[in-house]
């Protein structure tokens, strides 16, 4: 009864008003799975390729009707009749059908929409919540959230070069209290920014985007907001950064235009180490450019014992690239973005590789999101331990937090919240 009988895709809009792909997978039993794919702003050069139409007369060339057509024709024909429970086989069927290394023929956005919808349909058919379908009956751990409350870089039109300034409520007793903590800090920060005469406009991921003089000033304001909200920085709440350093790495230098700095790899490592000395920073994502593997090694050697060094653009959720990074001692954590690789099976393989290598895994959204909350179920089902899904505003971000609250309620007393223990590989 779990045979696929129909696959339908459509063009919908993401949180930035850009087109994306949504797919429905219908099973013989009558159940349906529906999924929509996200899209990134700062992207790794080796990510799987999302297919855009390039027709300037529609959506400024960003339409996805060709990807939709690929789902409704080639992909549909290839997987109708297959058992939705056979996720890996279906994913491999689509990979083989595409025939490229980066899913550029059919589009990673087309393939991923179907991959996710198949899983949702199979879970529904099994009578299991999605997180249980992913993780089985083993004990479930709720993820510690990375909450992006100040935006810079490609996510905001301001003077900050570092892309995300985040809080992590490690002192909370459960995910519900962690989300409350983040929300209270978010509102305290809004009042504080207003008081200081800064803009409270928000960026793509719902964080504030004030024009501040330096990254240290942004971190200091967050520290103040944490205290105003009634929490203790460094105890209840830790800080995290996503530098997205590839975006300001030019001609072999890290060019921090907002601070008028042009730094070598070693100097930028010193810069980040200085911030980590001044503030309770527990995680730095993409601290170096994806093109600067030597810089990554410097950063890992300098801070990797006490700070989570997360690879996003450098690893792009790709096990072949990630395996190379592990061998070279690059980072100690991987960011997991489902649309970077384009199928759930490959995503899950990257998480498993991280666990075997002693790396942490952070399940992540993209800056262009939808109401789809699949990543919340992935974070819990795979016991990833961490999730990064934006700020405490914009319903595309809140959808994931609300799903985590529902999952924790469903799990009851069996749900654990790791807090600081999520950083098991730090000293």
From Swiss-Prot:
Pathway: Carbohydrate degradation; glycolysis; pyruvate from D-glyceraldehyde 3-phosphate: step 4/5. Coiled coil: none annotated. GO terms for cellular component: cell surface; extracellular region; phosphopyruvate hydratase complex. The keyword Lyase applies. It holds the Pfam family Enolase_C. Binds a second Mg(2+) ion via substrate during catalysis. It is found in: Cytoplasm; Secreted; Cell surface. PANTHER family: ENOLASE. This is Enolase. It comes from Dechloromonas aromatica (strain RCB). The gene is eno.
């Amino acid at each position: 009864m779990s045979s696929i009988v129909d696959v339908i895709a459509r063009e919908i809009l993401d949180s930035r008003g850009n087109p994306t792909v949504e797919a429905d997978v219908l099973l013989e039993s009558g159940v349906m799975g529906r999924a929509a794919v996200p899209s990134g702003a700062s992207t790794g050069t080796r990510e799987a390729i999302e297919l855009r139409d390039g027709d300037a007369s529609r959506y400024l060339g960003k339409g996805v009707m060709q990807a939709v057509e690929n789902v409704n024709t080639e992909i549909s024909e290839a997987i109708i009749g297959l058992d939705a429970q056979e996720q890996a086989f279906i994913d491999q069927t689509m990979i083989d059908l595409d025939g490229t290394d980066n899913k550029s023929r059919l589009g990673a956005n087309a393939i991923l929409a179907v991959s996710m919808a198949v899983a949702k349909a199979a879970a529904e058919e099994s009578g299991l919540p999605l997180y249980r379908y992913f993780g089985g009956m083993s004990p479930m751990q709720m993820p510690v959230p990375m909450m992006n409350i100040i935006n810079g870089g490609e996510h905001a039109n301001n003077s900050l070069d570092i892309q995300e300034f985040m809080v992590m409520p490690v002192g909370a007793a459960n995910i519900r209290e962690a989300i409350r903590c983040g929300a209270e800090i978010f509102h305290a920060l809004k009042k504080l920014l207003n008081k200081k005469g800064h803009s409270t406009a928000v960026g793509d991921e719902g964080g504030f985007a004030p024009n501040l003089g330096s990254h240290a000033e942004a971190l200091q304001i967050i520290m103040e907001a944490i205290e105003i909200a009634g929490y203790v920085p460094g105890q209840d709440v830790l800080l995290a950064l996503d530098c997205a350093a590839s975006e300001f790495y030019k001609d072999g230098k890290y060019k921090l235009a907002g601070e008028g700095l042009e730094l070598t790899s070693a100097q930028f490592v010193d810069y980040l180490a200085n911030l980590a000395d001044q503030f309770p920073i527990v995680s730095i994502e993409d601290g170096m450019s994806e093109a600067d593997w030597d810089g990554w090694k410097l950063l890992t050697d300098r801070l990797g014992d006490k700070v989570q060094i997360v690879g996003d653009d450098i690893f792009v959720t790709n096990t072949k690239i990630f395996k190379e990074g592990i061998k070279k001692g690059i980072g100690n954590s991987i960011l997991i973005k489902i649309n970077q690789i384009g199928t759930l099976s490959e995503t899950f393989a990257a998480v498993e590789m991280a666990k075997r290598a002693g790396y942490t895994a952070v399940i992540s959204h993209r800056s262009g999101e939808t109401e789809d909350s699949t990543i919340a179920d992935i974070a819990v089902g795979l016991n990833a331990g961490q999730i990064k899904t934006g700020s405490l505003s914009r319903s595309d971000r809140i959808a994931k937090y609300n799903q985590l609250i529902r999952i924790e309620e469903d799990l009851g007393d069996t749900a654990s919240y790791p807090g600081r223990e999520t950083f098991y590989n730090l000293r």
